[in-house]
């Protein structure tokens, strides 16, 4: 019988800074050549599990270990980090923590340089993998000139060059646009088939992840593995809901249409599911019997106006934003989407005053160009994509209170506002924790809280739900909806196609620094040409409509959104 390449036996791990173990009594074997998906809520122990395999725990991050862990038949606690890196390659969730080169090419070549590979061979290897991960045109770019998604692809290319027998990817889709994420999964599948490596993918985006095939899914909750099974069997169970993970949208739609999902053999394959005449009948019946009116209307009063706005990072580069014309209306929830590097984050930074622009920005008919960053922050709050770029304090409470203290507010008033926001963001229980002890997703919530507490009129959120489990996804979005009802204008930069459909009244699509579409989100996702230009990808609801033969997919999508809202209000 084949020996496992990874074996946990009664394994527990506790960080020195925490009172209880993050991993508790883990027993699991992973075999050579397997492809395993690891899912779980934010802070459930997924990344800690991965870091125990790659050696960051205990060789970099210290803590108390009980039980046994064997990697490639060797006791994992007695080897060194260098030796482990020859067996396990990891693409970290935090791309800035992995990017060490001055250019993309230099970063990808780091291992080859250390191994004294001839320069001609080095260039061939780097070019080959840069082409594979879609970064061939960006090899000479500096890390600060790359988007979060582009940095992640550079890291992926640098790891793939090494060809280790075990490959771990921690949230590989988190910073990628939907189409690129789909291509990444296909690339990883091809690599897995070619190399027969053992692949472990840690991911929140379950619907997108299941586009790929996995041998098993490990589901984490509170530091324990509560499911170790096939994707189809997991979707049939109630374990995802128990763990705070959103099931694929089509699974929820099937249940709303009163389809018995437990009777479906291959539930993880949407095309196979929709071949059933019974499924087709039930879904069409649900659509015919239910109204799908959409009462989302955005307001007609402009709050923020951008006229011919351009941004160019240097005299020798092309414009990142090119003559952008855009109105943001009072009290709307606007989503901005587009491919990696389209200019979405640059647009947000231009509005906030972080970048020099040409053109004109007005706020309530008042010139915005002349205002400083500090003055603009009275009107516009910005939550960056990468939480590490925002965090300044060591403790959670102090980080959220920082802006209020800078404005001279009384400490008693600060306490009330900070604690209220921490409760809404699911962080109150951690208010006295050091930020260093938080997961990436938890850090994201801290940065959202630090901006929400300042109460600006416009709130721009760059990937507000990235790295969040379904429970905190709903908590954050429900809070944003309530802010919107109170008169706040919300701008969301997102790769989550269902988020823009469900929560925004209007969607602006950027491609190569220009606005290429500006209409309702459902119409955007129903336009295959726009989706292709901007690297968007229709949700499984659109795919379900196509497979079943529904001529107007937007009806199914809007019906689902309306029905889902009613169910979650109950």
UniProtKB/Swiss-Prot annotation:
Its EC number is 7.-.-.-. Residues 6-247, 304-537 form the ABC transporter domain. ATP 2 binds at residues 338-345. It is a peripheral membrane protein. GO terms for molecular function: ATP binding; ATP hydrolysis activity; ATPase-coupled transmembrane transporter activity. PROSITE patterns: ABC_TRANSPORTER_1 (PS00211), ABC_TRANSPORTER_2 (PS50893). It comes from the Bacteria. ATP 1 binds at residues 40-47. It is found in: Cell membrane. GO terms for cellular component: ATP-binding cassette (ABC) transporter complex. The keyword S-adenosyl-L-methionine does not apply. Keywords: ATP-binding, Cell membrane, Membrane, Nucleotide-binding, Repeat, Translocase, Transport. The keyword Heme does not apply. Belongs to the ABC transporter superfamily. Probably part of an ABC transporter complex. Responsible for energy coupling to the transport system. This is Putative ABC transporter ATP-binding protein SA2476.
């Amino acid at each position: 019988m084949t020996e496992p390449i990874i074996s946990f036996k009664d394994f527990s791990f506790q960080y020195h800074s925490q009172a209880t173990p993050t991993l508790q009594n883990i027993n699991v074997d992973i075999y050579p050549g397997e492809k395993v998906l690891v899912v779980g809520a934010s802070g459930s122990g997924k990344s800690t599990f991965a870091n125990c395999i790659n050696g960051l725990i205990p060789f970099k991050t210290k803590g108390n270990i009980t039980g046994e862990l064997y990697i490639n038949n060797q006791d994992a606690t007695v080897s060194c980090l260098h030796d482990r890196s020859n067996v396990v390659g990891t693409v970290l969730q935090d791309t800035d923590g992995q990017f060490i080169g001055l250019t993309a090419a230099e970063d990808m070549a780091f291992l080859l340089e250390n191994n004294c590979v001839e320069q001609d061979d080095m260039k061939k290897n780097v070019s080959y993998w840069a082409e594979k991960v879609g970064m061939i045109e960006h090899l000479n770019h500096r890390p600060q000139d790359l988007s979060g998604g582009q940095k992640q692809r550079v890291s992926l290319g640098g790891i793939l060059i090494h060809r280790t027998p075990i490959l771990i990817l921690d949230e590989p889709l988190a910073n990628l646009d939907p189409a690129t994420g789909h291509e990444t999964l296909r690339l990883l599948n091809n690599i897995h088939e070619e190399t027969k490596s053992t692949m472990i993918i840690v991911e929140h985006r379950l619907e997108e992840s299941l586009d790929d095939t996995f041998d098993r899914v490990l589901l984490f909750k509170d530091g324990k593995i509560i499911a170790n099974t096939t994707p189809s069997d997991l979707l049939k169970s109630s374990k995802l809901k128990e763990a705070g993970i959103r099931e694929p949208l089509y699974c929820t739609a099937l249940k709303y249409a009163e389809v018995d999902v437990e009777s479906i053999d291959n539930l993880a394959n949407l095309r196979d599911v929709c071949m059933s005449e019974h499924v087709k009948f039930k879904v069409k019946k649900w659509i015919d019997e239910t109204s799908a009116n959409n009462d989302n209307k955005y307001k007609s009063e402009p709050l923020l106006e951008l006229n011919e706005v351009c941004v160019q990072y240097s005299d020798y580069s092309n414009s990142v934003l090119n003559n952008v014309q855009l109105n943001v209306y009072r009290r709307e929830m606007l989503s901005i989407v587009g491919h990696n590097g389209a200019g979405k984050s640059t647009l947000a930074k231009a509005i906030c005053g972080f970048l020099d622009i040409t053109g004109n920005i007005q706020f309530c008919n008042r010139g915005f160009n002349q205002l400083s960053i500090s003055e603009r922050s009275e009107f516009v709050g910005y939550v960056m994509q990468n939480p590490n770029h925002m965090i300044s304090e060591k403790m959670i409470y102090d980080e959220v209170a920082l802006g209020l203290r800078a404005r001279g507010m009384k400490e008693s008033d600060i306490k009330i506002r900070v604690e209220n926001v921490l409760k809404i963001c699911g962080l109150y229980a951690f208010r006295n924790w050091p930020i260093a002890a938080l997961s990436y997703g938890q850090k994201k919530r801290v940065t959202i809280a630090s901006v929400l507490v300042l109460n600006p009129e416009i709130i721009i959120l760059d990937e507000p739900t990235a790295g969040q489990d379904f429970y905190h996804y709903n908590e954050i979005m429900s809070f944003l909806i309530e802010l919107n009802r109170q008169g706040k204008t919300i701008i969301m930069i997102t790769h989550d196609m269902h988020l823009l459909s469900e929560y925004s009244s209007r969607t602006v699509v950027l491609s190569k620094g220009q606005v290429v579409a500006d209409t309702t989100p459902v119409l955007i996702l129903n336009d295959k040409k726009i989706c292709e230009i901007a690297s968007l990808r229709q949700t499984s609801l659109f795919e379900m409509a196509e497979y079943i033969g529904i001529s107007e997919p937007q009806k199914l999508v809007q019906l689902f959104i309306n029905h889902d809202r009613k169910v979650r209000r109950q």
